[in-house]
Amino acid sequence: MKKGRTNLNYLVSARSLVSKVTFHEAVWLFPPSFILHVLEEWPRFTSWAQRYASPLYSQQDYETIHIAGIIGSIVFATIVWMFPVRAVVFVFFAFVLAPGLFFNVLFHAGATVVTSEYCPGVITALTLYLPVFLLLCRLAWSENLLNAPTLISGLVIAGAFHTWEVGHNVFKAW
């Protein structure tokens, strides 16, 4: 009985801690999530992409895109942290966060299902990207940094941007 109560106290404490985090603080979860995702993908994604997307996709492509992504995640987290206002959060959401996290989850999960083979990155996409994305959305919503119109339009922009980016960089379609 006492052990159950200890676990419950831990959960209550964790929930209390999370409830005190602000959007501009939580945005710092983005860079380490991105880095951990890259570490999962790095050794195997290129060969997977060459098999299922385009034989033209190279390790140099992967490294260029993802080193820029690591730098970008830090730069954009810094900008949002310094200027947590609606316009900045919307641009971050539409062009960085939603394409990089939410649509990346859909890409990796979908690719794993369609190919019936592990798509490198699916584990961190599901265990890190999705929870971090949902937390940041919830905090942005509760702090009135995103509302229904900006959330919906941001997702539409993010979906189009992610589709273009993956089509260009991974599938070499254009």
Task: Write out the residue ranges for each language-model feature.
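Cytosolic, membrane-interface loops and tails of multi-pass inner-membrane proteins
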Residues: 41-59
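N-terminal signal-anchor transmembrane alpha helix
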Residues: 20-40
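Transmembrane alpha-helical segments that form the membrane-embedded catalytic/substrate-channel core
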Residues: 35-41, 101-112, 160-171
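Transmembrane helix-loop-helix
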Residues: 76-103, 143-151
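Hydrophobic alpha-helical membrane segments
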Residues: 97-108, 121-139, 159
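Core segments of transmembrane alpha-helices
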Residues: 66-84, 103-104, 128-133
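Membrane-interface helix caps and helix-loop-helix hairpins in membrane proteins
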Residues: 87, 109-119
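Terminal transmembrane helical module of multi-pass membrane proteins
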Residues: 135-174
